[in-house]
């Protein structure tokens, strides 16, 4: 049961939950990916194309978010950094630049990865700013 001293902000909760999700996705991706960079459209985790470098990036994002979730200021900072980075990756993916496919196995504008990066980046920025005003009891 949470006490007043263990209350988390929504930004901390977001960072913790999405950090764990990104860690799990990063680990799971190693079971389906066959190449370090590039890759086949058949190397998918559910509907998301992955490769080993992509999985390492997911592990890093997860670790940064979890580390940031420890404090309110850390969560705001990590949510901002991850949000800006993911929106940038989404933009590059939507532009269909070849290096995104060659390096991270992120395909053109119809790729589920681009939409996921856009949504996650927007949520992270929301929780780095306006969405971090109230506190929630720790679970």
Region spans (language model):
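Membrane-interface extramembranous regions
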Residues: 2-139
